[in-house]
């Protein structure tokens, strides 16, 4: 693995990717399968990387997150919560016990999948940005439980969530909480620097929201993302270092 290519969201001084043979994490599971593990999670993109949400913004959202957390809703667990509320078959699936031994990565963060269920995040932490390890030095070894891989269910779950007329009581309860969290994410975590917005408008043009919608259609948004990646981006493990006040995305 490589353990120095992405220094916690800071793109300034970022070097080219050089993969190493050293193990970074040791992962064991009761039911081995594929997961995407998250460690450091940035919240707001600036020209030079990711940063945490402004304290004033978090303070203003404190009542919202108090209510969500008291009701068992955490942003780090939206996928398993959605699957359990919207798909009856999920409740019949066995949970997977996962043990992480952190050999060389930052021990301040727990490395967890989107399907995380066995580690209750801090109820007093506003913003739900990743899962922070306990202790001054973090944690090098820990165990949690997770649902089976749920990423593959994402299209069907979003379709069920959108079909509001056919949601049962459990689905409606999840939908209500998700809507409040969704609004916070859109207002807080999806802001882009003006330079990026300008370039994207040149590529994709202007857009308008459909009547009654609070955000752009997910299917069309995905198509736009794939279009930009395939037509305007070239994969490279070499990094051109930033100079001056250039934006990492547009440089």
Report each predicted region and the residues it spans.
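Helix-boundary/low-complexity linker signature
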Residues: 1-251
